[in-house]
Every structure is written in structure tokens, then in C-alpha cells.
Amino acid sequence: MGTKKLFYFLLLLCIVNSAIAQKIPTPKEHFGFNIGDNYQLATFTQTEAYFKKIAAASDRAKYTVIGKTEEGRDQFMMIVTSPENQKKLEQYKLISQKLGNADIGIEEAKQLSKEGKAVVWIDGGLHATETVGIHQLIETAYQLLSRNDDETMRILNDVIILITHANPDGQELVSNWYMRDTAKEKRSLSNLPRLYEKYAGHDNNRDFYMLNLKESQNIARQLFIEWIPQIMYNHHQAGPAGSVVAGAPYRDPFNFVFDPLIITGLDALGAAMQNRLNAENKPGYTSKSGSTFSTWYNGGLRTTTYFHNMIGLLTEIIGNPTPSDIPLVTARLIPNAATPNPVLPQKWLFKQSIDYSVSLNYAVLNYASRNRDELLYNIYLMGKNSIDKGNKDTWSLSPSKIEEMNRMYQDSLKRIKGNNESSRNQSTNVPVKFYDSVMKNKVYKDARGYIIPSDQPDFATAVDFLNALIKTGVVVQKATADFTIAGKKYPANSYIVKTNQAFRPHILDLFEPQDHPNDFQYPGGPPVPPYDAAGWTLAYQMGVQFDRVMEAFDGPFEKSPIGVLLKLNGSVVNSASTKGYVLDARANQSFKAVNILLNEGIEVYRITNVSNSSLYASGSFFISKNAKTKTAVEKISKENSAEFLAMSEKPSSLIKISKARIALWDIYGGSMASGWTRWILEQFNYAYDIVYPKDIDTGNLRSKYDVIVLVGGAIPSVNSRGGGGENNLSNIPVEYKNRTGRITADKSIPQLKIFLEQGGNIVTIGSSTQLAYHLKLPVTDAMVEIENGVEKPLSREKFYTPGSILRVTTDNSLLSASGMNTETDVYFDNNPVFKMNPDAVTKGIVKPIAWFANDKPLRSGWAWGQVYLKNGVAAFEATVGKGKLFAFGPEITFRAQAQGTFKLLFNQLYNQ
């Protein structure tokens, strides 16, 4: 062979080998079916192997593991972009970080916006029964790696795509469950035996400002610290009946703290997504008032990104591996602004939903490609706007401030015209002086920063709060010495959070109250429910003590590195005179330390009759000093954040405690409230058993347990016999049969009553406080009115408080409320409120634990008709035979976020 021929042969061989090397295995070659085929789902094990395989076969992809899941699986993220960009990933990541954190000058930002690549996050599978999510992710990944059309190549050149699995554990559970039946037509997603996220189930999409769960933590690190994408896209199911998919833009109200560029960015991307579907003759996209989804709530995977200057997209699409139908909804057939291209009733296949999802992904990626530099610069601009606002006097508008302007104006009219003068015909143009009276009044100004003093009783919980901020990219500073701000002295080791940083909206949202507007279907009509909570201020939920700083300030402050969590060590000081140690009941970590001590066989006592001037609260714990306890205490203080007070004298009034045998109610399929409570108990070292309704019906409970915890949803209403609410469970595997059933008035309640009478204690939370009515205790519903001589519940037009923070007064002299402040913030979601029989209170049969002391208990959120709450009892304890029932109307363990009220559960979990 001649030299020239040899050259061309070798060149051809290289081309062929390159083509072979870049051959991307199709989904069918790997899974044995096409993505979207009827009756077919991929497991996580199969999906993980496929992503590894295609990443190895393509120079467009990099497979990474972002952390472990709660069940120990690898959670992966595949980074997709052009081969040239893959070589410079760290450079582009740094550009994205610099622009996202916005701590650079305008000219540098403009230059980096030209140099950088748009970063787009696309996830799937968060809610594992919403099976389109992870399967569209598989198909999208394949197409991005295998297609060579002009659009795909341009996208790969301009965009870095973070393709992320949001819930590996859930996919493995759900897909195996669906595929277990060999008869395809019998396959079903129904009757899943447990939660598809170990602790939270569907609530895994409510964890993104608290970040309790490992999956949430993994995702947050990539979103808020590592990559800071300009767009994130969160796939869900399902849209409203009569549509195919619901998406951006979303209905009002949107949250007032984030930048308006978020809203207009959602408008632009929503238009791009709708246009793509319409151009491809894919009808059925609805937005705005066409669905219930809004941008008010913080804490969802999508919504938390708004408070970090990212354009967060959600679509909710129909579709199931089992063929389904689009029903006839006549109200959706006429085109309007929300649904310009309605879909007609028809049969619907899984593959159609996959195709729609891929089109939507491409619409987003095409937008990012064509608007790359604008997206990069706008995230910088939003961050810079936040920094600028934090550096100067700023007033944020809110409904209550508008109400204050209107009130002042109306008061002025009354003074001028007289009290009987109607203002109905007055001009809607309010004089500007009333705006100035509010929006130039320093009382209404935004804070420049927040100080979290290190000398607060539960500093460890405050540090947990700060770590939640740090996990989302917020910068926290630590005082290296004592300092004084606005005339108040603060100790060293206090923490400072300034608002002059890019993620200022998130800071304000977690420190300040949410001011939800009064939102009604029409004047005088029923309220429009918020999509999730109306108020959630995390600092309030966690009981964190902090001070607002209203002017520019500085001090001996040291910045913590971005994303590095704070570590708080416990302490103990031993001396020859030490007789024992006290763990303050005001600190949550004290209960964890007590549980460790009890597990080691060390005697622990509770201290009663503590004076108000004491360094610790009534109900705190005492441990006598000896060689064993000294070693244990020192070890616990090193490994945990518990503070041991060394005592030179043994307290005089002590009650010995012991470990209680704890039972926690759950049901077949899993209760999210029970799942979160499991998480809490495990975090604080409480041993427990799960009990199902059949276990309760069997009886003999007192021989096995000392305390039964019944979270919301366990107890049926007194107007219901209970026992309903389950699908046909005849074909479930035998190992789950013992979990079926519901608590009933006929079988279960009598066994619970016997348990109480024999000396057991029961803790009820939320709707499960209905047990008090089943037991005919001397309490009644406070949220009622008398109409025509008949008692009936207050209508929603008169009283409506969706998920919000309210303030209650607490009797912390009771052992059940040890460690609580006299004024406590609670999470309240139209929960039960009680009236006590005065004679029963006098006789000590029932004792109020917490109550609404005034007619304005709202702290954050929305409480229409809150005046009705005044004097209502939020929590009580009642003697039943030898035992006690503890009834907590508010959600004291809410999503493992309400750490300020955890003690109301913990106090009841000992024999004492």
C-alpha cells in the first residue's frame, strides 16, 4: 500500500473509530423498551447504569455523584455540554458563581456575561409516583447526547445543562412496585406500601429552605453554592383536568421580596414554552389563573430558587405508563389568556407526555442559548440590586403597609368630614403624604442585618437555623469579640447576617413575617387558598432570638466561608466542688443528651420548683457526678452541642425519669406527618416502635408501651366512624397486610381509652386531638357560632388561617411545657382550638398548656378573622384514669421545621 493510500486508510479508520466511540446506546438497547412505551417503567438501578453508560460513551457528558440519599444510594447529576465546554467546566462554574453572588463590578460582570455559558438545571423524579419526571429526563439526556441537528449543537455550545435525579430511592420503590405484576394491564401505581422518600414522601418538595433531608442538601449545594444556574426546571405531575400541562407564568400572589426580573423572566420563558408547543401542534398548555400554582411560597425545589435570583420553572403534566384519558371539562374548551390553545378530550399515552416534556426542555434550552448573555447579566443584576438595597435605607411594600396608608387617609377624612361621613364616594387617589408617612417612616424600614446573640438559652437551635441559611449560599459572620450595636452589648461568638448580599430576598423571607394579602374569590366570598403555606418565617418556627439592625453597622466580624457549616461544641466545666450537672430544658439538644445518658444506664432527674432568677428553666435535667457520669458528660459535650452546667449543690426538688417505651402511629402507604416525626425522634436519639391501626385494635397496649404519639390524620372525626379512606388492598404482598386499616371509633378508641386508664400517656397533634371528643372530655370546639339557636362551625368567610405562624401564651410551670417561653410561636393551619369547662379546670381534670391571649395572634402569614381566636385554648392536658392525654392543636412538629415547639413533644416522652 502506498504512503498516500495508507494515510487515507488511517484517516478513515480514525473517523470510523470515532463514530463507534460516540455511538450512544439507545434507551431500548439498555432498558429493553422505548421511553414512553405503555406499561413500562425503569428502575433507579437501571437508570443509574444507563446514565453511567451514555456518559462513558459521549464526550458531551460528565457523570457526577452529588451525595448519598437517605437510603444510601448515589444521587447523580450529569453535566451535558459541548466537548469544548467540558474541558473548561471549572472556568464556567466560577463565572456562574461570580455572577450569581454578584460581588464584582459592573464592567467585570458584563465581560463575564459575554464569556460565560448559560447554566440550566433540569431535574426529574422528585415525586416518584409522578413517573413522567424521571423518564423524560432519560429521554432528554439521550437526545442531547445523540442528536447532531443545528439546534442541539447550538444549545450544547451555549449552555451547560445539569441533568439531575431528584429522588433515586423513590424511583426504585415506585418502579419495582408498578412492574411487579407480570400482567401488564394489571400494573398500577396505586397502593404504594410506604412513603417514596424515607421520611417525607411528597413533602420532600417542602424541605428546600430547611434542608433536613439528604437529597435536599445534595441538590441545594449544587443550586446555591456550586453552580448557581440562571434557570432551573422542576418537572412534576399532574396538571388540572382538561389540560395537558400547567406551567409558567403562575397566578398571583407572587412573593414581594424577590426581584421583578424573576416575574418577567417567568413571563418570557413561559411564552417560549407555549410557543414551542403551539408550533409543534401540541395543545393543552395552561398558565396563570388556569392552575393553582403560584410563586408565593418559599421551600419548594422550584420556589426557593426565586429567592436566589434564579428563574424557577415548574410544569405539571398528565401521563401514566398505563394509558389514560383527558376528560371533558367544558370550562376549558374556549381559548383564553390562561389557555390559548385548549386540548380536546381524548385518549392519552405515556409517550405523548414524554414528547411534550422533551419539547418543553428544548424550549427552555433554546431560550437559554439565544439569550445566554442576558440571562448571565440579569442574575448578576438581581444580585447587585439586592446588595444595593442592603447597603441603604430601603422600604419594601406589602399589603399591611398599603392598609396602613388607607387607614390613615380614612381617619383624616373622618376628622375633616365627621365620623358619619361616608368615604364611599371619595377619590381613590390618596394624597402622597400618606405614602410618605409609611414609606419614609423608619419604623417600617427594612433591616440592614440581624444579630443572633450567643447567650440565648437555645443557641444550638439558632446555629441550626444559621446552617440552613448557609446551605443555601447565604454569608454569615461571626463576632470574634464582644461588641455594641445601637447601644446594646453583644457577646463574642454571636452571629451576624447582613442583608447586603445577593440572596437578600431569602434572608428577609426567613427572618421577617410573610404578609399574605387578603385573597378572596370575590368581595365577601370564600378565600382563595394559598398553594401551600401563607406564612413560614423560619426564625419564628425555630424559636430563634435575634435583633434587627436598622442602620449600617460593623464590628469585629469574621465571614464564614460560603457553604461551610457552623460547628458548635458543647461545654462542661468540672471542678472538685462539682456535685452534678444540669441540662437546661430550654435547649433542644439537652433532650438528646438526656437520651444518650439514659441509654448508658445513667440516672437522670427533672428539677421542679425552679426560681425565676435561676440560670436554667423549671423542668431542666440533673445528673449526679460520679466517675461514670463525668466521663459520659465530657464525651457528650465534645460530640454534641449540649451545654452542661456544673452545679456545686444538688437541687432539692427532683423527679427521677426513665426511658419511655414510645409507639408512633403510622398507616399503610405512610403518613408524612408520622414520617417527619420519625426523623425528629431519630435525630434526638429517641427509640420508638411504629404501630399500625391493627396493632392498636389488638389491645394489650399498656404492657408494651408507655407513650403513644398520634400525629395529624390518625384519629377520625367524632362525626365519622373511621375506617374508610383505603383503596382495594386485596392484592398487596402479605408482608404489608398488618399495616392496613384505619383507627375506628368502634375498635380502636376503646383500646386507646383502656391504655390511658391503665396509666399510659397519649400525645395527639393537629386533627388527632379529636380523641378528646371521642373520650368525652370536658372540652369543646372554640371555633363555632350560634345561629338560630344551633351551634355550627365558623364559615371560611369569617375565619380562615391557612398555614401561618401564630403566637400563643404558654404555662411553662407545667412539666408538659418545660423549657418553653411564656410567649411561643406556633405553626397553625386551621387547626383545632378548644374551650375548657371551667369546673373541670378548677378540679384539675384538664389544664390549659397554651392559649391565644389576645385578638391579634398573627405573626406571619394570613389569619382572616383572627379575633375569633382570642381566649381559645391551643393545647391542654387531661387526666384519664391513671394516664394523661396531651392535646396540641397546632402542628408542633411541622415538617421537622418547628423546632421552637419540639419540646412540647419531647417533654411527654419520659416516664416521670
Predicted regions located by residue number:
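Acidic, glycine-rich active-site loops and adjacent beta-strand->loop/helix elements
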Residues: 126-128, 164-170, 210, 239
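Core alpha/beta catalytic barrel or barrel-like domain that forms the active/cofactor pocket
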Residues: 188-210, 232-250, 273, 469
